């Protein structure tokens, strides 16, 4: 659906892997521990299509922003989850396969090119800033720490790039989960 219509996508922590992290339409994880580009993309969108997301404080950093001055479409198979933490403009109860089959049968006539160009530029700036901070942090630690120290963020990124494309990543709860979600490169729409 997103590819057919060129729709930018973000993900909660639980939804990571729905799209590969290097997919051109994927702008990052949202929430308190989310990525800058993902949060900004969602907060500045005119329409937010939430699929199976709970809108809890950890998954959405500012629930008020996803309902403020925008259309919120919330799809979930469980009617109890819809509107639980943020009131949708359009609630849709159903199996996402059936909902998206119906969506895909329609032709959207919306031009997102300007929005996508802005998001791509912003993502490139954020990624460059992030890489610079990561490199500086590694350089600073090399000066202060022993040679046995490995920056966990760099380790997770390097390990994920070395893994098979269909690898499934597992992270325990804690800071390592946050590092994994923020730094692992998930390809082929796998799982975190």
Where are these regions (language model features)?
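Short, exposed beta-strand "edge-strand" segments with a Pro/Gly-rich flavor and a Y/T-containing core
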Residues: 6, 76, 88-94, 143-150
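Anionic-ligand anchoring segments at beta-strand to alpha-helix junctions in alpha/beta enzyme folds, i.e.
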Residues: 1-45, 161-192
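Generic hydrophobic/packing signal
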Residues: 7-8, 50, 60-61, 70, ...
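Glycine-rich, acidic loop regions that bind phosphate or pyrophosphate groups
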Residues: 15-125
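Conserved catalytic alpha/beta core of Sir2/sirtuin-type deacylases, generalized to analogous enzyme cores
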Residues: 5, 99-101, 105, 137-139
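A short acidic, amphipathic alpha-helical/loop segment
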Residues: 1, 60-63, 158
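Active-site diphosphate/adenylate-binding microenvironment
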Residues: 123-192
């Amino acid at each position: 659906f997103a590819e057919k219509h060129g729709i930018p996508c973000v993900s909660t922590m639980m939804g990571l892997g729905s799209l590969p992290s290097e997919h051109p339409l994927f702008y990052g994880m949202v929430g308190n521990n989310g990525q800058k580009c993902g949060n900004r993309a969602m907060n500045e969108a005119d329409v937010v299509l939430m699929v199976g997301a709970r809108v809890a404080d950890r998954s959405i950093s500012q629930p008020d922003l996803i309902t403020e001055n925008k259309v919120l479409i919330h799809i979930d198979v469980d009617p109890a989850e819809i509107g639980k933490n943020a009131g949708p403009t359009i609630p849709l109860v159903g199996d996402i396969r059936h909902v998206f089959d119906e969506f895909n049968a329609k032709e959207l006539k919306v031009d997102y090119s300007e929005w996508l160009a802005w998001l791509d530029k912003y993502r490139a700036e954020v990624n460059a800033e992030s890489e610079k901070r990561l490199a500086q942090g590694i350089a600073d630690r090399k000066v202060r720490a022993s040679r046995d120290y490995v920056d966990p963020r760099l380790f997770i990124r390097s390990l994920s790039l070395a893994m098979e494309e269909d690898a499934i990543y597992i992270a325990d709860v804690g800071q390592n989960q946050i590092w994994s979600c923020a730094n692992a490169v998930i390809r082929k729409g796998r799982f975190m």
